[in-house]
Amino acid sequence: MEFLMTLVFLVLLVEIVFCTFFMLPVSMHLRKNVYNKLDKLFGGQNAKIFLKVLALLVIIVFCDSIVNSYNINKKLHTPELTGAKFDRQNEYTRMFRYQRNSYICGFCLYLFFLIYRSQGIISQLSNVEASKTAIEKQTKNNLNTVETLLSENEKLKTEIKDLKKMEKEHKAMKSQAENTTKEYLKLQEEYNQLLGKKPKTQKKDD
């Protein structure tokens, strides 16, 4: 039992150092780096098994200390044993030791679950930030694509406008050419009439 309590005390010291470090006014970047290194260190399968076994041992010592402390307290306050001859001072010393062990184990378990939960929260925050960075990058790429499409759309609108203008000019030139041809044929017909000649179409009919 003394060996287990020594082990629990060492674990408690490590947890206190760990929590004290993260209560210091250090940058969030440094905290994340430490958390990431610890996650790599204790994220393996063997490390997880070791931590679970260690937590189980602390829980066993905690429960054993509470049970023994309760039994000794009950023994000291039992009316039948009040007048019995036994070393009450020794029993009080044992009860004090078990109560001390229960306090140390309880605080150790509390810090253990606190650190475990904070590690999970930091891991979730890191994943959220990574997702946020990826989303921001994708959004930026989408905005660049949209800007490129809008620019191409403006160019297409300009080209369509120019094509419509050219089409109108072509229609105007075509109409003008048709009018010029009609006028030319009319003048040629009048000219032929003045010369007393028949049009080619009439000659073919003859």
UniProtKB/Swiss-Prot annotation:
Signal peptide: none annotated. A motif (Di-lysine motif) lies at residues 203-206. GO terms for cellular component: endoplasmic reticulum membrane. Residues 24-46, 123-206 are cytoplasmic. Keywords: Coiled coil, Endoplasmic reticulum, ER-Golgi transport, Membrane, Protein transport, Transmembrane, Transmembrane helix, Transport. The chain crosses the membrane at residues 3-23, 47-67, 102-122. It is a multi-pass membrane protein. The keyword Protein transport applies. InterPro entries: BAP29/BAP31 (IPR008417), BAP29/BAP31_N (IPR040463), Bap31/Bap29_C (IPR041672). Residues 1-2, 68-101 are lumenal. One of its GO terms (biological process) is protein localization to endoplasmic reticulum exit site. Residues 140-198 form a coiled coil. It is found in: Endoplasmic reticulum membrane. It holds the Pfam family Bap31_Bap29_C. PANTHER family: BCR-ASSOCIATED PROTEIN, BAP, ENDOPLASMIC RETICULUM TRANSMEMBRANE PROTEIN. May play a role in anterograde transport of membrane proteins from the endoplasmic reticulum to the Golgi. Belongs to the BCAP29/BCAP31 family. This is Endoplasmic reticulum transmembrane protein YET-like.
